[in-house]
């Protein structure tokens, strides 16, 4: 063949399909499985990190900073894998790798670092910022705000209605809408990945004949339907404000004020609530002064007990601390019953959670406190403390696991009868 004809054949020959060499993008089920696996290992790393921090900083620090420890564990997990350009354990489980939006290259270092900051660290600061804004915002005049002025134009009414919406509801709506879009398209599981153009692709060749055809479009449709129903309810409330439905306006204002996520009360409100509800806080020396200082601290949070609660073994903790402990340390689930067992933190003895003596113990200590503060009982206050501790010392002789200056559940009825 002459050289001229060979050149002509090369010129008219079709160009190779470079797209055939690209990796195939991952589908939604594979991405969800990888995310679930990563969430599990992040939890394991958080527990290990919490144990290490507990050795150096103490148990009280781990109980007062659980959110910070979770953020640190998530950032550490992604920094050791994604930031260094390696796969996470979840990505290794289903063989996924990060590629750019068009699938032609691997995401750069700055994109990976920005994704880790936006995914693991930024939500923590946003949450703290929203909480601070919520707590620092001064309440407006309730009389003028409960009823929307009918003389205002529609634009100002809409602006007032939107101003009553909380940050948490807006963020939840955005997240639900984004996850619905992911279920339909299967492209970006997180908003941060969409912002930094980080998509998942399979690291191996996919056999489409063996790949199941099912996907998550149905879940996306259900989420969209839920958002539509919520939007209709909000639109109905907006129309009701224009038509003068004051009852609906007041209910909306009450619902907006009851923001569970960001409505953290101030210290003054907490103290006022404690006085109204009669909560026992042993940090106050004036409450139950006959209890020794060495016995006023909780063994879980290492701070003064709030609403002391006695287990069957007699050891006492804060009500919230022992409930959180029981939720994390459930041992044997009762079959056919709504109860479960747990072990005491101090003596590791088994007890039934429904038998925690918070109410009875609270009533007993309140009753004894009133008797100790009465005029006829002040003269024998020291004698009462001695008798109280002697009785409990006898009980401790019968039960070596009794903590000493607090009654066990077995003696609560006895003291109620005596006093």
UniProtKB/Swiss-Prot annotation:
The lineage of its organism: Eukaryota, Fungi, Dikarya, Ascomycota, Saccharomycotina. E3 ubiquitin-protein ligase component of the peroxisomal translocation complex. The two types of peroxisomal matrix targeting signals, PTS1 and PTS2, are first recognized in the cytosol by their receptors PEX5 and PEX7, respectively, which then carry the cargo to the peroxisomal membrane. The peroxisomal targeting signal (PTS) receptor-cargo complexes interact with peroxisomal membrane protein (PMP) components of the docking complex. The E3 ubiquitin-protein ligase activity is stimulated by PEX12. Zn(2+) 1 binds at residues 298, 301, 318, 321. GO terms for molecular function: transferase activity; zinc ion binding. This is Peroxisome biogenesis factor 10. It is found in: Peroxisome membrane. It is a multi-pass membrane protein.
């Amino acid at each position: 063949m002459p050289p001229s004809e060979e050149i002509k054949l090369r010129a008219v020959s079709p160009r190779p399909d470079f797209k055939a060499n690209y990796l195939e993008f991952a589908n939604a089920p594979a991405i969800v499985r990888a995310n679930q696996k990563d969430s599990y290992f992040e939890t394991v790393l958080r527990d290990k990190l919490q144990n290490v921090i507990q050795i150096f900083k103490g148990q009280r620090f781990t109980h007062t900073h659980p959110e910070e420890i979770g953020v640190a564990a998530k950032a550490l997990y992604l920094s050791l894998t994604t930031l260094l350009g390696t796969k996470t354990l979840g990505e290794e489980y289903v063989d996924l790798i990060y590629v750019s939006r068009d699938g032609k290259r691997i995401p750069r270092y700055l994109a990976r670092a920005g994704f880790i900051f936006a995914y693991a660290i930024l939500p923590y600061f946003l949450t703290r910022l929203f909480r601070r804004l919520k707590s620092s915002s001064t309440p407006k005049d309730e009389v003028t705000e409960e009823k929307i002025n009918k003389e205002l134009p529609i634009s100002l009414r809409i602006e007032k209605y939107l101003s009553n919406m909380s940050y948490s509801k807006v963020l939840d709506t955005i997240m639900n809408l984004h996850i619905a879009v992911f279920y339909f398209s299967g492209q970006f599981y997180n908003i941060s990945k969409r912002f930094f153009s980080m998509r998942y692709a399979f690291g191996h060749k996919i056999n489409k004949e063996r790949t199941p055809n099912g996907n998550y479009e149905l879940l996306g449709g259900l989420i969209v339907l839920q958002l539509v129903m919520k939007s209709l309810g909000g639109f109905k409330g907006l129309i009701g404000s224009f038509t003068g439905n004051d009852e609906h306006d007041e209910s909306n204002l009450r619902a907006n004020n009851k923001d569970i996520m960001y409505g953290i009360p101030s210290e003054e409100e907490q103290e006022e609530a404690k006085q109204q509800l009669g909560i026992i806080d042993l940090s106050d020396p004036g409450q139950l002064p006959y209890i020794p200082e060495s016995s006023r601290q909780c063994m879980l949070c290492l701070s003064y007990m709030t609403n002391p609660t006695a287990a069957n073994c007699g050891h006492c903790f804060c009500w919230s601390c022992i409930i959180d402990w029981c939720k994390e340390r459930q041992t044997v689930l009762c079959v056919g019953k709504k109860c479960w067992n747990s072990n005491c933190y101090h003596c590791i003895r088994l007890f039934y959670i429904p038998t925690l003596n918070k109410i009875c113990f609270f009533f007993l200590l309140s009753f004894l406190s009133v008797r100790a503060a009465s005029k006829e009982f002040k003269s024998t206050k020291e004698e009462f403390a001695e008798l109280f501790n002697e009785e409990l010392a006898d009980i401790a002789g019968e039960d070596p696991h009794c903590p000493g200056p607090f009654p066990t559940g077995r003696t609560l009825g006895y003291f109620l009868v005596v006093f």
